[in-house]
């Protein structure tokens, strides 16, 4: 790997006669996460963290498309949304980027806490609470508990789906009042006059 341009190697095993510097660690996975968190913290950048049972990717794409009209935006590619993919996405950031739109996927308790420590989002968005990963999370209440671990470390705003029966019960978390979006007029930010135009896309008014 040194011949291919690597500045150093991170390894769980001692290397015999290494051809360059290497860092010996107990866990390369944990080292990946720690280095990513350090790198993210070194950048003057705003981070939007997106999670939810369904709709994460389309929400990420929409938010990134809107923000990119004014800012230099980096977004999660493919399904790089777990404890390996998220750090790799963060390593793609440069000083030229102004906003990162990061998808954050989990399947068990504690994962969101670890992801949030890495990403350190300024804003978090939760699309909904559905019936995914029940093998570990057991119920929608379990999914709600796991997803809302993101509230512990979000820096500024919490944006929630006000049409979701589990999410709309949240009034305040860690001193922050959620901003609600949805299809119903009871949400401060909602959609009206939805028109589906087939291959031309969908049109709507945001109120």
Residue ranges and their predicted role:
Residues 26, 133, 193:
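Pocket-edge structural micro-motifs
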Residues 1-34:
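N-terminal leader/targeting and accessory segments in enzymes
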Residues 14, 30-162, 168-177:
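Phosphate-binding loop of NTP-binding sites
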Residues 25, 76, 181:
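Hydrophobic residues at beta-strand termini and immediately following loops
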Residues 9-16, 162-166, 183-184:
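Short, polar loop motifs at secondary-structure junctions
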Residues 140-141, 172, 176-207:
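Adenine nucleotide phosphate-binding catalytic loops in nucleotide-utilizing enzymes
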Residues 15, 28, 79, 184-186, ...:
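Short, solvent-exposed coil/turn elements at secondary-structure transition points
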